[in-house]
């Protein structure tokens, strides 16, 4: 798709494209048989110079105070907290934060929290936790949504997660059999009742049907206007305010059955 | 639209300009006419990407950033031809810089780069309507929106349905449309933003611009290029307008390699272009205006912005 033609300046290099030069005949008036229209369509990459003093000067105060903000310490972790297949301690921690935030904002009982596995990148390192740590950990712009879900649809949703090897969750426990089917699903330690109504908190990405969550799309929803980063920040600070390092639930939310 | 279609369409468009040139008898007579070249440069969905994409951002690593963008803009302005710099909305997004400054930096960056006009996208409302109004007023930036009624919000009196920009002897009409926000974002007071039909409003506004004898009418659109379900999009607007020459699109993050050309309601053509997202791509459309004929598109360049690698 990229062909070579020419370059604009010494600092910019163009990998181009194609030039179309076409002629066409105009039959009605043979006197002016030929008109030329020349159109260049170009699609190319440009390497621009890196620094611009005007931009640097204007941006400096913002980057300084932004870095100060990103480096501000909000909590402490005693150990590295990792994401594992289907969640792991880090998945438990972040979904626990979602559950707490939803509880605080809606003042209703929230039964479970879920997050799609790709929502987290990397791990939470041992030591001071800064705001910047959270931006690196949660690069996507997810916001929280509380949804009302019937037991039957919730079960369908759990099967969808189990087929993937389990997602990040808090409040729900199940077993996954060799066929990737969820078994013995329990919400808040109780079996799921198909006709009962539950409240769950998920990311807006999932609520809009992302990651094959189409069953969530038409559920009654309350958007919380809170980002996942803000949610985790508040959760971590709730430990720090008690002069404690963060507590992480390491128990797996589901078990695999091999038989 | 594939390349062949585009060429075919362009031949048709060329025919039109060709026909109007024919009575002049001789194409060499072109020199006796006064010619003005106009370059339209445009971005969309820059999503708070003030800096180039970080090294761990996969295919986009090291791309974009306002310093690269400024260089391109300066190069084009340096040619001496009038240049128009436009943005089709979503200059903000959830990011550390947006969380810290709520859109102030993004708007100041647009002011610094000398944007001539811009419209809004749904993400620009993330910090709330009042916050958006405050940031727009503080930076002195007025968005172009013709299919929303903001009268009952703090944005009242701080947006225009269209603007007319004079560049040398050219009169350029710019209008703006954005998608129905209600199912895209959830912010308090959203019920006070009154959506008006995009096609109807765009036609109404473009007609005003035509009455004012604009040489070219450009629509900044945050509708999205096209959808399978046929809901309102740039494609729908392009096919159902009377006198819009160019639609600068956004929202769907499409990296157009070349513009799409549609036949509109007045058997003329409306061109749609979109420049990806994140400030990775810039679109460029070069028009030539002569005093005897109309405008003619002579060149389109869609430019990918890469930062110089440290070696």
Show the residue positions of the predicted features.
Chain B
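Acidic, metal/ion-coordinating pockets
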Residues: 3, 7-308
């Amino acid at each position: 798709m990229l062909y070579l033609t020419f370059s604009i300046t010494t600092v910019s290099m163009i990998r181009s494209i194609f030039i179309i030069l076409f002629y066409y005949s105009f039959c009605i008036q043979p006197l002016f048989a030929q008109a030329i229209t020349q159109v260049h369509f170009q699609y190319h990459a440009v390497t621009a110079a890196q620094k611009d003093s005007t931009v640097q000067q204007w941006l400096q105060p913002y980057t300084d105070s932004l870095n100060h903000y990103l480096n501000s310490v909000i909590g402490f972790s005693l150990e590295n907290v990792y994401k594992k297949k289907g969640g792991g301690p880090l998945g438990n921690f972040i979904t626990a934060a979602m559950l707490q935030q939803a509880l605080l904002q809606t003042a209703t009982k929230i039964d479970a929290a879920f997050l799609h596995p790709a929502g987290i990148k990397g791990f939470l390192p041992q030591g001071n936790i800064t705001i910047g740590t959270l931006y690196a950990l949660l690069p996507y712009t997810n916001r929280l949504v509380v949804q009302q879900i019937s037991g039957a649809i919730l079960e369908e949703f759990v099967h969808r997660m189990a087929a993937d090897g389990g997602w990040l969750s808090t409040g729900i426990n199940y077993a996954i059999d060799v066929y990737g089917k969820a078994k013995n699903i329990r919400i808040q330690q109780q079996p799921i009742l198909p006709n009962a109504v539950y409240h769950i908190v998920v990311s807006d990405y999932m609520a809009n049907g992302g990651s094959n969550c189409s069953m969530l799309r038409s559920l009654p929803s309350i958007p919380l206007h809170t980002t996942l980063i803000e949610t985790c920040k508040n959760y971590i600070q709730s430990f720090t305010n008690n002069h404690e390092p963060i507590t992480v639930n390491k128990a797996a939310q589901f078990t695999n059955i091999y038989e | 639209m594939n390349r062949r279609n585009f060429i075919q369409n362009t031949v048709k468009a060329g025919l039109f300009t060709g026909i109007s040139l024919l009575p002049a008898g001789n194409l060499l007579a072109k020199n006796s006419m006064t010619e003005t070249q106009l370059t339209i440069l445009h971005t969309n969905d820059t999503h708070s990407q003030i800096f180039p994409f970080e090294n761990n951002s996969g295919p986009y690593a090291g791309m974009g950033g306002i310093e690269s963008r400024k260089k391109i803009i300066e190069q084009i302005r340096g040619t001496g031809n009038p240049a128009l710099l436009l943005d089709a909305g979503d200059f903000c997004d959830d990011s550390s810089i947006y969380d810290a400054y709520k859109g102030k930096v993004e708007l100041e960056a647009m002011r610094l780069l000398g944007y001539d006009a811009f419209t809004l996208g749904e993400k620009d409302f993330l910090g709330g309507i009042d916050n958006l109004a405050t940031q727009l007023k503080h930076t002195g930036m007025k968005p172009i929106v013709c299919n929303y009624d903001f009268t009952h919000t703090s944005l009242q009196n701080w947006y225009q349905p269209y603007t007319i920009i004079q560049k040398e002897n050219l009169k350029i009409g710019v209008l703006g449309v954005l998608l129905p926000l209600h199912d895209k974002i959830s912010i308090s007071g959203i019920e006070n933003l009154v959506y008006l039909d995009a096609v109807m409003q765009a036609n109404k506004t473009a007609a005003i611009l035509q009455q004012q004898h604009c040489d070219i009418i450009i629509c900044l659109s945050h509708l999205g290029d096209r959808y399978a379900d046929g809901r309102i999009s740039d494609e729908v607007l392009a096919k159902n307008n009377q006198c819009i020459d160019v639609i600068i699109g956004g929202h769907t993050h499409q990296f157009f390699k070349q513009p799409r050309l549609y036949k509109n309601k007045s058997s003329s053509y409306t061109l749609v272009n979109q420049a990806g997202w994140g400030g990775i791509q810039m679109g460029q459309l070069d028009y030539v205006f002569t005093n005897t004929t109309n405008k003619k598109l002579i060149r389109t360049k869609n430019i990918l912005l890469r930062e110089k690698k440290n070696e």
